Amino acid sequence: MTIAIPEMIDAVFDVSGDRVPVNYPFALWKELTRLVPELAGDASIGVLPLRTTGSATGMLLPKRAKLVIRLPVSLAPHVASLSGQPLDVGHPLRLANGRLREILAYSTIHAQLVAGADDEVVFAESLSACLADLGITASLICGRKSSLVDGDRRIHGFSLVIHDLKPEDSLLLLYAGLGSHRKYGCGIFVPYKVISDLY
């Protein structure tokens, strides 16, 4: 199966702030589309999960936290306006100047949460079938089960490592992702260097 996807790129912004709520992805997407309405109409756009540390009062941001938006190259000029902007995701954040980062192929990639069934066997079988439909041969390792919850909205799934990828298949998955809810950080892959770190 061949699918047409646009060439993608990562727009990277340093983020200043102390913490974010556990359900911050919903408010973050709302803020981003408020500031850059062009983002709202393209389902291929994804927002990578922020690197955080859990605490009793929310999720703490490290000093070098970064917001990464994966989007078609054609839309990259629109997000330049995010530089220096404040964001309200339940706690205040501010973005520094952004830069563009090329997406490179890696044989092993990882997604923090891929949306799907809440049963691991069903989840793995569904993703294996999806990869087969794409003509991709690779190995899967399902990790931790987790959920995103915001009121009545609930997104379930597992973290996922895909390894033994050919370069062209890696780029396809890095560009297109797997599953739904990319705007909330789901199904977006990044390089993963040590498989044992999953456990």
Where are these regions (language model features)?
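RNA-interacting cores
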Residues: 1-199
